[in-house]
């Protein structure tokens, strides 16, 4: 009897779409059930302890990881204990392979290309008239650390000053409740240069492509870089961190070993905002190497499916 080509997948903010489409195009089918004896493998975005039941339901079948976020999963450096039974972790770019090796991730890592949006050449701007600011968003349980709230507020204050001077418009694209982003008081000020827009972490890019400058953190910022839109990140020198409460909040353990490689070169919290914005909008030279390492090449669906099938 010919084996059935059925897989189980965890969905996360549409980040699974390219992987799922590649599998479907090669004759695989997604199981509609959490547990099924006919499933050949699982494809998940994370392996933290809260998802133990998901792995138990695999009944020993192989499983793989696709990227939970655009930034490589350096939280495995002391914040989260990785499971050791992952058949392979798929990553978007060379940085994912390098950093997982650097922190001693115990399972195989396979680069399959950037999957979250198209990769486009940089398009310079003369001015930053339209700025999209995407604050660091709270977890699903509404928790956001005090350090991230401070970063959000400081970045916002700097952008407002810049907007006042240059008559720019800042659209604050926030996820979940504004108070959980640490910006409730800022919203109450009703600044004339600021538009507040509640959004969803669904992979949409409209607020990126209509902007002259994007200021953000992690996935939204990485997508802006991929799309060729001038981008500043925020608090890049602060060690990566993880936690769903203050009690469980931790930083990575070996940040000094790889921070120079990982830090995005242009940060809104750098000393001279005017100079940093100008560098961001006029050329991609400062971030070209970073983009090659952290965005890399477009997603290769056949390479991904081949890698799955070779490991079953």
Feature roles, as predicted:
Residues 4-119, 221:
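Active-site and donor-binding regions of nucleotide-sugar-utilizing enzymes
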Residues 16, 117-185:
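Conserved catalytic-core segment of nucleotide-activated headgroup transferases in glycan assembly
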Residues 27-36, 197-207, 272:
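Short acidic low-complexity segments
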Residues 35, 40-43, 66-70, 112-115, ...:
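Short loop/turn segments at strand-loop or loop-helix junctions that form parts
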Residues 35-38, 87, 129, 209-213:
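Conserved acidic residues
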Residues 176-222, 226-227:
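Donor nucleotide-activated moiety binding/catalytic core segment of transferases
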Residues 219-296:
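Catalytic binding pocket for nucleotide-activated donors in carbohydrate/polymer assembly enzymes
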């Amino acid at each position: 009897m010919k084996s059935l080509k059925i897989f189980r997948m965890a969905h996360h903010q549409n980040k699974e779409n390219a992987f799922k489409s590649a599998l479907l195009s090669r004759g695989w089918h997604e199981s509609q059930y959490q547990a099924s004896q006919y499933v050949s493998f699982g494809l998940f975005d994370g392996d933290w302890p809260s998802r133990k039941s998901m792995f138990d339901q695999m009944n020993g079948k192989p499983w793989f990881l696709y990227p939970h976020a655009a930034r490589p999963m350096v939280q495995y450096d002391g914040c989260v204990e990785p499971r050791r039974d992952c058949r392979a972790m798929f990553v978007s770019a060379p940085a994912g392979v390098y950093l997982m090796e650097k922190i001693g991730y115990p399972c195989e890592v396979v680069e399959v290309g950037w999957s979250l949006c198209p990769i486009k050449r940089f398009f310079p701007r003369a001015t930053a008239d339209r700025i999209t600011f995407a604050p660091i968003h709270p977890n699903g349980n509404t928790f956001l650390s005090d350090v991230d709230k401070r970063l959000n507020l400081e970045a916002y204050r700097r952008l407002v000053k810049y907007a006042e001077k240059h008559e720019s418009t800042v659209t604050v694209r926030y996820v979940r409740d504004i108070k959980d982003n640490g910006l409730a008081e800022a919203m109450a000020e009703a600044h004339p240069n600021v538009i507040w827009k509640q959004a969803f972490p669904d992979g949409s890019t409209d607020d990126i492509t209509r902007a002259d400058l994007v200021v953000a953190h992690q996935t939204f910022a990485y997508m802006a870089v991929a799309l060729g839109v001038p981008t500043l990140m925020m608090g890049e020198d602060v060690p990566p961190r993880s936690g769903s409460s203050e009690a469980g909040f931790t930083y990575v353990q070996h940040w000094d070993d790889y921070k120079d490689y990982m830090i995005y070169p242009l940060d809104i919290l750098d000393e001279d905002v005017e100079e940093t914005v100008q560098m961001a909008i006029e050329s991609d030279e400062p971030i070209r190497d970073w983009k090659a390492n952290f965005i890399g090449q477009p997603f290769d669906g056949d390479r991904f499916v081949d890698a799955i099938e070779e490991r079953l």
